[in-house]
């Protein structure tokens, strides 16, 4: 896909980030079913997700677009195969997202609360975990220290300290 870096270079950079920022949220987008993608290529994508331990991945299936080089490439991938691969990668991503969130439940997190809906305030930790907290006071546009209570698409948290 014309990437200007190797797998090894990518892993090296991820390891440097992890060395200096162990709880950094590393995210990625992954296309499955790009023309010519072999089962071995797909399995390597799965291995990279495991090796890096991404906090979140966005998976999408390649779709043919007119007037692109990829549209006329040989070895187009069957839709059923793309669907199966996408489902496997999404499940793996969710597994690693939960691991990441559980690891971050151990330490206080700073959150900028940006939205409110009927006494629930929503924001992101500094390492991109989406959280919500109930509060009687207005938290909108405030940074607060929180304890994450659970995992999920939007994790529940409680305000700690002031």
PLM features: residue spans?
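Short hydrophobic alpha-helical module
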Residues: 20, 60, 92-96
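Conserved non-cysteine loop/helix-boundary elements of the Radical SAM core domain that shape
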Residues: 1-56, 62, 67-81
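Terminal RNA-binding accessory module
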Residues: 72-162
């Amino acid at each position: 896909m014309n990437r200007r870096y190797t797998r090894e270079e990518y892993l090296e950079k991820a390891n440097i980030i992890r060395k200096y920022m162990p709880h950094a949220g590393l995210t990625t987008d992954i296309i499955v079913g790009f023309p010519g993608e072999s089962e071995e290529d797909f399995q390597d994508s799965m291995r990279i997700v495991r090796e890096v331990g991404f906090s979140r991945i966005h998976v999408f299936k390649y779709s043919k677009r007119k007037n692109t080089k990829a549209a006329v490439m040989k070895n187009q991938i069957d839709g059923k195969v793309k669907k199966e691969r996408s489902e496997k990668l999404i499940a793996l991503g969710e597994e690693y997202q939960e691991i990441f969130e559980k690891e971050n439940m151990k330490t206080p997190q700073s959150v900028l609360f940006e939205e409110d809906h009927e006494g629930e305030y929503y924001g992101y930790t500094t390492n991109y975990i989406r959280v919500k907290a109930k509060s009687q006071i207005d938290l909108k546009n405030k940074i607060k220290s929180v304890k994450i209570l659970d995992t999920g698409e939007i994790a529940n948290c409680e305000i700690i300290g002031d």
